[in-house]
């Protein structure tokens, strides 16, 4: 399960514009927005591109993209 709130927070803190992130992932901005809002899943390659663009550590990447479901 993806921690969308944490991902959006990291994007905002990075100062990188959505269109630039989308381009880095080979997506349209609308497609990236859909993924950020849980309408579509991220592909492994997109997770890699976003992790690099946002300078995520392996721990941060795992906390965002591989968050565990907690009751």
Question: What residue spans do the PLM features occupy?
Answer:
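Short, charged recognition helix plus adjacent turn
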Residues: 9-10, 14-15, 34, 60-71
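Recognition helix of helix-turn-helix/homeodomain-like DNA-binding domains
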Residues: 27-41
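Residues that mark the N-terminal boundary/hinge immediately upstream of a DNA-recognition element
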Residues: 17, 43-46
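Short basic helix-loop element that most often maps to the first helix and adjoining turn
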Residues: 4-24
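Key DNA-contact positions within bacterial/archaeal DNA-binding proteins
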Residues: 19, 30, 59
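Residue-level detection of the helix-turn-helix DNA-binding "recognition helix"
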Residues: 12, 23, 37-38, 48, ...
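DNA major-groove recognition helix of helix-turn-helix/homeodomain DNA-binding modules
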Residues: 45-60
């Amino acid at each position: 399960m993806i921690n969308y709130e944490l991902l959006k927070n990291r994007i905002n803190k990075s100062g990188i514009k959505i269109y630039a992130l989308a381009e880095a992932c080979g997506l349209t901005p609308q497609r990236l927005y859909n993924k950020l809002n849980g309408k579509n899943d991220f592909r492994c390659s997109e997770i890699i591109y976003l992790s690099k663009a946002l300078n995520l550590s392996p721990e941060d990447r795992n906390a965002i993209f591989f968050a565990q479901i907690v009751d």
